[in-house]
Amino acid sequence: GLAERMEFRLCDGLSGIAPAEADTIAIAGMGGETIAAILAAAPWVREQGCLLLLQPMSAQSALRPWLQRQGYRIEREHLSREGDTLYTALQVRAGFMEALTPAEQWAGRQSRETADPLRLEYLTRLEARAARAVTGLRRSTRASDVPRLEALEAVHRGLAKMREEWITWQP
């Protein structure tokens, strides 16, 4: 069975795995920054073209552009639900990926060919989160918050456009 073909190790990141020992690596249940740090400490993962199955619990908007800058491409994203929580899983390999828009950094890329029944709910939730952040920053009187506000407004507009686009693509 599957248990004979898999090996599990407890180690700091990928430090306990030699480069030739793995062709597929799953990193799940931690934040996007932690996932990026684990991959940054193991450049052999990209060099060997390992398949990565990543499930960031937070900071997806930091992980996606980090992957792009480091020479990875996101081949596929899949949404799943447990209770009221939506989770994103990324299938990633070494390779070129076009730069992501600010909204795509939050939500991932979408295309007409993507069939995901949770996508509309996901986009709606992200758009609402961005709107709340924009509202909060608009209350700020600190000049240092202006660039963050402008960036979040761009994210919010992009997410709204992605949601509208997604709706028009549905049968």
Where are these regions (language model features)?
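Glycine-rich nucleotide phosphate-binding loop and flanking beta-alpha elements
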Residues: G32-T34, Q60, E98
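C-terminal substrate-binding/active-site "lid" region of AdoMet-derived donor-dependent transferases
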Residues: A40-R93
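An accessory alpha-helical subdomain
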Residues: P102-P171
